Regions:
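Fungal secretory targeting signals
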Residues: 1-21
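A compositional/structural signature for long, glycine/proline-rich flexible linkers
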Residues: 19-352
């Protein structure tokens, strides 16, 4: 079976700073990820996920199959075709999730890039929204932002906290090119586990401040959980604090239209660029040297290697990782079209 491999080595600079006094209400004792906001957004995504996209899904399957065909891979092979169908369905749902939480005047913390999972609140199955080489041990959350406004993120760390992570500012919801970053190791946390980040366009050197570039549209928050017995993601909520600003909430029709637009953009980007130009163009069974990529969604403090392998049942591939100055590395393995195998039942990645 032809599979993809992606290795990331992350180097993070740390700086000792003091947390300024901040008086905020105690945060609710809820799941750090499955929050009431998350449940509300998941319910809306589930309601809208059958939006009229059959034509776009057909285009996506055809485009991905065309790309793999250029490299001698037959997408009509039953298991590959099944992988393709799953990947296209999840890519479509991920575009809907982006469209649901895209308004900088109505910012919410939304966990995305998840495998299919049941809703604990309402009992329905939430479709998977993985795409573009998700990391099974990453908790991904997004917040829409705009440099015109001021925001505050309030959070709380429980247990061991995450292994690694950070806040990456991106300027495009599809390509998700990095235009700024705040490494998690710079986050100053109070002794009770609480923390506050301020976000606006200023280049302040104050602790826990994130400067929003003029072209940023969203923050991708990553919490890496390497030891699921001791480490936990941080709880986070966001508030826009610019006075006197308001906007109507998005309608379901506008969300669906925006999702279709994101899907149309995603098809050539993830098929031609990520799968073809970034991955399959490399020699098979060779893990290429990691490089910095700002063109695709990788963190500014991260170097990455997009590679692919095709082994028989009697072959093995040995990969040697030399971490160098990196503080953390991960080696995930994916199905052909860039989503992880079932992380609940299969070993799909290794990390430091």
């Amino acid at each position: 079976m032809h599979l993809l491999s992606y290795i990331a080595l992350i180097t993070t600079l740390t700086q000792a700073v003091a947390m300024p006094a901040y008086n905020f209400a105690s945060l609710p004792e809820v799941s750090p990820v499955d929050t009431p906001t998350q449940q509300r957004l998941d319910a809306l995504a589930h309601k809208l996920h059958q939006f009229a996209n059959s034509e776009l899904k057909a285009q996506a399957r055809e485009r991905f199959a065309s790309v793999t065909g250029q490299y001698g891979i037959n997408a009509q092979f039953p298991t590959i075709q099944q992988d393709l169908d799953t990947s296209v369905d999840e890519l479509a749902f991920s575009c809907l999730q982006k469209a649901i939480n895209v308004g900088p005047l109505h910012p919410m913390v939304y966990s995305v890039l998840n495998p299919p999972r049941p809703s604990k609140q309402d009992g329905f199955m939430i479709p998977g929204g993985r795409y573009a080489n998700d990391h099974p041990e990453q908790i991904y959350r997004t917040i829409p932002v705009n440099a015109k406004y001021d925001y505050v993120i309030r959070g709380k760390r429980t247990g061991g906290g995450p292994q690694d992570g950070g806040f990456t500012l991106i300027n495009n919801h599809t390509a998700q090119s990095s235009v700024g970053a705040f490494p998690l190791r710079k986050l100053v946390v109070n002794t009770d586990g609480t923390f506050v980040l301020t976000l606006n366009a200023t280049n302040s050197t104050a602790p826990n401040h994130v400067s929003i570039p003029s072209d940023a549209v969203s923050i991708m928050i990553r919490n890496t959980i390497a030891d699921w017995k001791t480490q936990t993601p941080d709880y986070m909520e966001v508030e826009i604090v610019t006075p006197g600003v308001s906007a109507p909430s998005a309608t379901e029709e506008s969300i669906v239209n925006k999702a279709r637009g994101y899907f149309s953009e995603a098809i050539p980007f993830y098929a031609d660029f990520l799968l073809g130009n970034q991955t399959l163009t490399n020699p098979v069974n060779v893990i290429v040297q990691p490089t910095v990529s700002t063109a695709f969604r990788t963190v500014i403090t991260q170097v990455s290697s997009f590679s692919h392998y095709n082994l028989s049942s009697t072959e093995a591939l040995v990969i040697t990782v030399q971490p160098g100055p990196s503080t953390y590395w991960i080696l995930p393995s994916y199905r052909l079209f860039g989503i992880s195998d079932n992380p609940w039942t299969r070993l799909s990645h290794l990390s430091s």
